[in-house]
């Protein structure tokens, strides 16, 4: 219980007292989203329409409430901790709204929702939030239990707590004040959580009984209401169907494995408790079959397979390839490709470790048989061939998706970059690199048919790579370069057509070269027309620019008319500004040439008088006695 207090944003203790214990922490974390959550608690939460149908009885849309809350508060991204914090905050607000607090900050007073309190359906919602909070904590611990096995015990404890709250909700709904639909939903909810708990305990019989009960109730509810209301119930039935089949298989129904394999191919695959268990089940089934597998034949040579992990991978190879072909969505295909490549890499690593100890096998060449490698090395080459071929198929599938996106002229979206031919060029570069690695596999150097087959595949992908390089040149109007590349595409494609007679079966899965030839021919015609139009446009632009772009402002060419679009822009060339410099007459300069020839009157008499006055005159001048 104490661990639940670690939830950021408010998580209280376990049990019915969780809402009161989350008071301090919950208010801080819930203020951001508190507006909507407060509105949920100020009115009866869901079931108002049902109240009218069943008179004054209480109604609660249990499945609808939990699905909407989960989608809006973290479970869309698998964030169980966020959803758990939301449940704690909503509990606290419900208790505050209903005045059903668990004491105060100084003293805890435990309270339970009883049948006498059922005057408002929010009391039922309070118990539902208790169960949801415990369930979300269990799912959070399940994510962490992969790295910390000790947390599995805590996970089971939280699931038991969730079942306890669900049973309490079911008991309250048995009251005459609650309508029949809510009673059925409470029973289905309890059966669902109980089934999950039994599933974790590997009590398959009890789990399948609980899941079947849940499925039956939801199917009955779906058939009793309109199609819009039945969508949620049908979704829940689809969610628990894989769990039912898994339990049936563990009880002894061997036919269930085929249905589980088909469920894995559906969009999104399986989720929750079943995802990891289903992968483990498939591996376990293949391991049982691997005991009968002792050898594998590839390109006319049979080699023994003694490594169990390699046997399991080779047994599932055909199933994996069929699953990729049958996949409904691109996301599922990509997930299956990645899973297959991961298994193949693991098998190659095991074989590589077996090759290290034996020095003779590290030399790869058997004495007396040049060009022939050991069985273990040949098996390594076979697994590498599978890995590279799968990588080529995955990249080819991605290239097809990008080609479809290029053909669909979608509006520009700033948030998402539209695909470009350069993206396809990169994919085909990777494919060609994988083909080069295939040619270098040990043990296949003398296989002329294999070398020829890979050479033809290389020509096919080179043709497509050249085609998209030409497309990228067309986008930047480099017509001559694009035309040369189109001719190169036709050259590669014609070589494939001339040499593909004996390899049609191996090339049937590759892109159609004849279709590429037709497309290139049409593109060449379009390119030549576009080049001619572009040349005419360039000539007209040069002619008009020679008439207009002569650096003359409008004020100097009033006498000639030219359509100049720049005149209506902010950089219109109307006048020279600032004006240019022009020569003007300067101010005349006068020189006094007669000054040197003028004789001025003598001043000696005045200078003598000033000299005679001396000190006496100076003193008189100071005191003002000078006349």
Swiss-Prot record:
Q: Identify residues that carry N6-acetyllysine.
A: 452
Database matches in InterPro entries: SRP68 (IPR026258), SRP68-RBD (IPR034652), SRP68_N_sf (IPR038253)
Which UniProt keyword terms apply here? Acetylation, Cytoplasm, Endoplasmic reticulum, Nucleus, Phosphoprotein, Ribonucleoprotein, RNA-binding, Signal recognition particle
Q: Name one Pfam family in it.
A: SRP68
Q: What is the effect of changing residue 592 to A?
A: Loss of interaction with SRP72
Q: Does the keyword Nuclease apply?
A: no
Where does it reside? Cytoplasm; Nucleus, Nucleolus; Endoplasmic reticulum
For the region Disordered, give the residue spans.
1-53
Renumbered to this chain, the Gly residues biased-composition regions fall at 8-33
The record's listing under Gene3D superfamilies reads: Signal recognition particle, SRP68 subunit, RNA-binding domain (1.10.3450.40)
Q: Which residues carry this modification: Phosphoserine?
A: 48, 241
The lineage's top-level taxon is Eukaryota
Region (RNA-binding) residue spans: 52-252
Mutagenesis / variant outcome for changing residue 609 to H: Reduced interaction with SRP72
> Any keyword Nucleotide-binding?
no
Q: Which CDD domains match?
A: SRP68-RBD
**One GO CC annotation, please?**
focal adhesion
Q: Name one GO biological process term.
A: SRP-dependent cotranslational protein targeting to membrane
Mutagenesis / variant outcome for changing residue 598 to A = Loss of interaction with SRP72
The UniProt GO MF terms for this protein read: 7S RNA binding; endoplasmic reticulum signal peptide binding; protein domain specific binding; RNA binding; signal recognition particle binding
* Domain notes for this protein: The N-terminus is required for RNA-binding.
Q: How does it assemble?
A: Heterodimer with SRP72. SRP68/SRP72 heterodimer formation is stabilized by the presence of 7SL RNA. Component of a signal recognition particle (SRP) complex that consists of a 7SL RNA molecule of 300 nucleotides and six protein subunits: SRP72, SRP68, SRP54, SRP19, SRP14 and SRP9. Within the SRP complex, interacts (via C-terminus) with SRP72 (via N-terminus).
Disease link: Neutropenia, severe congenital, 10, autosomal recessive: A form of severe congenital neutropenia, a disorder of hematopoiesis characterized by maturation arrest of granulopoiesis at the level of promyelocytes with peripheral blood absolute neutrophil counts below 0.5 x 10(9)/l, and early onset of severe bacterial infections. SCN10 is characterized by infantile onset of neutropenia. Anemia and thrombocytopenia may be transiently present.
Family classification: Belongs to the SRP68 family.
Q: What does this protein do?
A: Component of the signal recognition particle (SRP) complex, a ribonucleoprotein complex that mediates the cotranslational targeting of secretory and membrane proteins to the endoplasmic reticulum (ER). The SRP complex interacts with the signal sequence in nascent secretory and membrane proteins and directs them to the membrane of the ER. The SRP complex targets the ribosome-nascent chain complex to the SRP receptor (SR), which is anchored in the ER, where SR compaction and GTPase rearrangement drive cotranslational protein translocation into the ER.
Q: What is this protein called?
A: Signal recognition particle subunit SRP68
- Organism, scientific name: Homo sapiens
């Amino acid at each position: 219980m104490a661990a639940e207090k670690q939830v950021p944003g408010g998580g209280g203790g376990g049990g019915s007292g969780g809402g009161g214990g989350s008071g301090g922490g919950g208010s801080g974390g819930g203020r951001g989203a508190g507006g909507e959550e407060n509105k949920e608690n100020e009115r009866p939460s869901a079931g108002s329409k049902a109240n009218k149908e069943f008179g004054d009885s209480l109604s609660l849309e249990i499945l609808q409430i939990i699905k909407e809350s989960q989608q809006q508060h973290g479970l869309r991204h698998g964030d169980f901790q966020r959803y758990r914090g939301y449940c704690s905050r909503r509990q606290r607000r419900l208790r505050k709204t209903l005045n059903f607090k668990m004491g105060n900050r100084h003293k805890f007073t435990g309270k339970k929702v009883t049948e006498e309190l059922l005057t408002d359906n929010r009391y039922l919602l309070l118990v539902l939030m208790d169960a949801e909070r415990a369930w979300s904590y269990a799912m959070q611990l399940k994510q962490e239990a992969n790295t910390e096995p000790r947390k599995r015990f805590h996970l089971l404890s939280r699931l038991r707590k969730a079942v306890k709250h669900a049973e309490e909700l079911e008991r309250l709904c048995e009251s005459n004040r609650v309508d029949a639909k809510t009673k059925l939903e409470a029973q289905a909810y309890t059966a669902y959580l109980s089934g999950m708990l039994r599933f974790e305990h590997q009590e398959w019989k009890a789990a399948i009984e609980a899941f079947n009960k849940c499925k039956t109730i939801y199917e009955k509810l779906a058939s009793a209401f309109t199609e819009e209301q039945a969508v949620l119930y049908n979704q829940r039935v689809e969610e628990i169907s894989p769990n039912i089949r898994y339990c049936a298989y563990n009880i002894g129904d061997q036919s269930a494995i085929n249905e589980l394999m088909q469920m894995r191919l559906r969009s999104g695959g399986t989720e929750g408790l079943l995802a990891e268990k289903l992968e483990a089940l498939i591996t376990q089934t293949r391991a049982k079959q691997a005991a009968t597998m002792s050898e594998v034949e590839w390109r006319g040579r049979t080699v023994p397979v003694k490594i169990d992990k390699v046997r399991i991978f080779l047994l599932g190879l055909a199933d994996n390839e069929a699953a990729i072909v049958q996949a409904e969505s691109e996301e599922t295909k990509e997930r299956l490709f990645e899973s297959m490549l991961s298994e193949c890499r693991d098998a190659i690593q095991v074989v590589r470790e077996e090759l290290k100890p034996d020095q003779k096998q590290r030399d790869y060449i058997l004495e007396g048989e040049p060009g022939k490698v050991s069985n273990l090395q040949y098996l390594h080459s076979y697994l590498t061939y599978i890995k590279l071929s799968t990588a080529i198929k995955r990249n080819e599938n991605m290239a097809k998706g990008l080609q479809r996106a290029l053909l669909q002229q979608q509006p520009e979206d700033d948030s998402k970059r539209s695909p470009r031919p350069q993206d396809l060029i990169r994919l085909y570069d990777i494919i060609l690199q994988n083909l080069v690695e295939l040619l270098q596999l040990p043990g296949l150097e003398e296989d002329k048919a294999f070398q020829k087959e890979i050479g033809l595949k290389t020509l096919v992908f080179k043709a497509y790579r050249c085609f998209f390089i030409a497309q990228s040149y067309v986008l930047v109007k480099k017509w001559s370069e694009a035309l040369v590349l189109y001719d190169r595409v036709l050259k590669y494609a014609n070589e494939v057509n001339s040499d593909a007679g004996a390899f049609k079966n191996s090339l049937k899965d590759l892109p159609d070269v004849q279709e590429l030839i037709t497309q290139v021919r049409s593109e060449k015609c379009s390119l030549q027309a576009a080049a001619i139009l572009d040349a005419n446009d360039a000539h007209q632009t040069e002619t008009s620019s020679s008439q207009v772009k002569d650096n003359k402002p409008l004020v100097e060419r009033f006498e000639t008319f030219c359509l100049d679009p720049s005149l209506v822009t902010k950089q219109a060339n109307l006048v020279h500004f600032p004006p240019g410099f022009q020569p003007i007459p300067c101010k005349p300069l006068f020189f006094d040439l007669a000054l040197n020839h003028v004789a001025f009157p003598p001043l000696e008499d005045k200078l003598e008088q000033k000299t005679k006055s001396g000190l006496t005159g100076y003193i008189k001048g100071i005191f003002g006695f000078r006349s």
